[in-house]
Amino acid sequence: MSENPEEIQVLVNHVRSTLQSLMIEKGITYMRAGESKGSILVTPGFERMGYVLLHTNGENCHLYKLKNKGSFQIWTKETLESHGFQPQHASYYIVLHFDNTKEINFSKHPKLRQGINTYRSKIRPLSDFLY
């Protein structure tokens, strides 16, 4: 199956349950950047990313629209700490801002539990979540 080059993408991001509520409160999600273990690989489709789905171990899923499609910021560990987060595994992070005032109900519930890949951030088409 070939990818639709026009389709909006969703960043699927596993977060610890203790961190998920703070991310939703702040409208911020982040992933490790650089050469640290678990850092995200920016691949084709990233520029079409319009949503973020936060989950914990493939469950407790929350879908939100990004404030700026396909864009992200690079923050230091210290900048995240100044926003109330406690990052532990890298010096730099990819940060995305989302509209935390309007959670989006999604009609499809794809399998997010995929062994070790459950915990890796990935980009998936919006059609995996909405009809």
Go through the PLM ranges and name each one.
Residues 1-49, 54-58, 103-131:
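Compositionally biased, charged N-terminal/linker segments
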Residues 59-131:
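Aromatic- and Lys/Arg-enriched surface recognition patch
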